[in-house]
Amino acid sequence: MRFADVIGQDILKQRMRHGVQVGRIPHAQLILGSEGSGNMALALAYIQYILCSERSAEDSCGLCGSCKKVSALIHPDVHYTFPFPRKAGEMEQCSDVYPQWREAIKEDTYLNYEDWMQLLNAENKQGNIPTKELRNIIKNVSL
């Protein structure tokens, strides 16, 4: 996903580009917005811009190895965490449903929570991020 593919949000895209260009990328950022606002698309474009080895002042190249890996949602330096309905022995951490998540996000970066739960046949179960997944996050980001 490139910034050019993100609809609107021009001021925010410019701030993100500027931070990368001057070498001031916050160690953590929360990109939050209402459903359908395109924040997942914006986050993916930002990740790709940061990791691109051939970026221009305006956007990632979309062609280098890093861009291709980010676009395929398989870059080893990017970790995704998302809610899912826990099913004992089946789905106990995000990695158990990465293939479905990757396909769903590639198909629709504007995917909402209800549609995601429906794709996983959650029935009446709520999605959550279990303790085991939180421990994995801590392990992955520990220096």
Each predicted region: which residue ranges?
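Clamp-loader machinery-focused feature within the broader ASCE/P-loop NTPase space
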Residues: 2-143
